[in-house]
Regions:
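His/Met- and acidic-residue-enriched segments that coordinate or traffic transition-metal cofactors
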Residues: 1-63
Length: 63
């Protein structure tokens, strides 16, 4: 993997982390249960994406 590609993946992990933090902070101020459930689902999706990116980077470092 080139340095440019590595930087892209590191940025993507950072972006996913930021989105997760924003969604978690947003949850603290929402009282509508439908909206809360939607935000929790979205947080879960972004957590999965972040883990996939991290796992991919780990696999690349082992090669």
């Amino acid at each position: 993997m080139t340095q440019k590609e590595l930087a892209y993946f590191e940025d993507a992990v950072g972006h996913e982390s930021n989105i997760i933090k924003i969604l978690e902070d947003l949850l603290k101020s929402i009282s509508d249960n439908r909206v809360v459930e939607f935000i929790k689902e979205e947080t879960g999706k972004h957590s999965v994406r972040k883990e996939k990116l991290i796992n991919f980077l780990k696999e690349q470092s082992n090669e």
